[in-house]
UniProtKB/Swiss-Prot annotation:
This protein's record includes keyword ATP-binding: no
Family as reported in the entry's similarity comment: Belongs to the RnpA family.
Function: RNaseP catalyzes the removal of the 5'-leader sequence from pre-tRNA to produce the mature 5'-terminus. It can also cleave other RNA substrates such as 4.5S RNA. The protein component plays an auxiliary but essential role in vivo by binding to the 5'-leader sequence and broadening the substrate specificity of the ribozyme.
Catalyzed reaction equations: Endonucleolytic cleavage of RNA, removing 5'-extranucleotides from tRNA precursor
NCBIfam families referenced in this protein's UniProt entry, alphabetically: rnpA
Keyword tRNA processing part of the UniProt annotation: yes
Annotated signal peptide: none
Gene name, Swiss-Prot/TrEMBL: rnpA
Keyword annotations of the record: Endonuclease, Hydrolase, Nuclease, RNA-binding, tRNA processing
EC number from the UniProt entry: 3.1.26.5
GO molecular function: 3'-tRNA processing endoribonuclease activity; ribonuclease P activity; tRNA binding
Organism field: Escherichia coli O157:H7
Protein name, as recorded: Ribonuclease P protein component
Enzyme class: hydrolase
């Protein structure tokens, strides 16, 4: 049985871990959201989230975006390559409803899977 938990090992926690991804990322994006990824040597994917107050004013909207992104990652973690991902929310992401945001994330996860197979 596949575990769909979201333990601490699957998160980017320190600034150096984020910097590692920002140095040489593979990018996949939409006008509202970008996912940066970089291969890691851990054997499993990890995720970090950046939702700036400048782009999404209200705290409950930022929390909704982060919650939906974490849930999308949690459900797809076993299909994703061993990469560190940073999800960057841009202006306009707060205008997406839950379904549109989930569909955009699914499309970007699939694109990263293709990019990882190609490299």
């Amino acid at each position: 049985m596949v575990k769909l938990a979201f333990p601490r090992e699957l998160r980017l926690l320190t600034p150096s871990q984020f910097t590692f991804v920002f140095q040489q990322p593979q990018r996949a994006g939409t006008p509202q959201i970008t996912i940066l990824g970089r291969l890691n040597s851990l054997g499993h994917p990890r995720i970090g989230l950046t939702v700036a107050k400048k782009n999404v004013r209200r705290a409950h909207e930022r929390n909704r975006i982060k919650r939906l992104t974490r849930e999308s990652f949690r459900l797809r973690q076993h299909e994703l390559p061993a990469m560190d991902f940073v999800v960057v929310a841009k202006k306009g992401v707060a205008n997406l409803d839950n379904r549109a945001l989930s569909e955009a994330l699914e499309k970007l996860w699939r694109r990263h899977c293709r990019l990882a197979r190609g490299s």
